[in-house]
Amino acid sequence: MSTLLEIKNALNNPYVLISWDPKTDCCDWLVVSCDDKTNRITRFVLTQSNLNLPIPTAIGDLKYLEDLAFHHTNMTGQIPQAISKLSQLNFLDLRWNRLTGPVPSFLGQLKKLTYIGLSFNNLTGSIPSSLSNLPKLGGLLLDRNQLTGSIPETFAYFVDKDFYLYLSHNQLTEIPKRLGHTNFTWIDVSRNRIGGDISFLFGKNKSIGTADFSRNMLEFDISNVEFPKSLTNLDLNHNRITGRLPEGLTKIELVSLNVSYNRLCGQIPTGGRLQKFDYTTYFHNRCLCGAPLPTCK
């Protein structure tokens, strides 16, 4: 209880913690939850509050925490080193704040983490390779920050069959070829500065469902790329992709597709769902033609 009261004091006794009365059982307080058997605090989830303060370092003294969230609470400063003491943590949600500094490399020490959400902050620097040390990680959300450099090569070690990677709206420049060994379920690296070829991320034996690489500087020939049948959403708009759309796209049950604003040529393959999309899916290419675009000459 003393740790919780220290946290409350560090947060300037916000109204959302009005139930935190030391005369009552802390397991009945809002924001926290306790294990039914041990009565130890295992959950701290604070949302939708305009606190405008750093994350209290005392949070690291809640050593049995499994879930920790300061979500949309306007937290400031850097992510505190104290979080590295939370060895039981499996869920970390610090999205929608004003956190600064780097993505901490010490997060790679928290081996039970399955989810890291740091989206919508002001984090800078490169993505730490230490995150690949997390054997259970299934979701990594670092979108809407100011991250730079390459996606770490060590991300090829992620083995979770349902891996979700959100890195959009940053300033990343490279996806290493070794990531072709990783089987992403969902990858979004849109609105970065990534160039070159990313076709190695696809393949008929992959299980990728959603892939968004829009608004980058990708340059590769798409003609012979094999897309997996699991693919339902593909967005490649606003790049420098060349070649013809592969016939294999007709065998995929796509829900959404966007290849506009590239340098594609040739006839749009006929069949599957490719003619069910409107012309905006394909427009502003070099010489792409055929339904739903004008007939090829």
What annotation goes with each model-predicted range?
Residues 37-78, 82:
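LRR N-terminal entry segment and analogous cap-like coil->beta motifs
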Residues 38, 60-65, 84-89, 108-113, ...:
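Leucine-rich repeat
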Residues 49, 73, 94-97, 118-121, ...:
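Consensus "Asn ladder" position of solenoid repeat domains
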Residues 55-57, 79-81, 103-105, 124-129, ...:
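The feature encodes a structural signal of leucine-rich repeats
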Residues 71-119:
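Right-handed parallel beta-helix
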Residues 98-201:
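Solenoidal tandem-repeat scaffolds enriched in leucines and small polar residues
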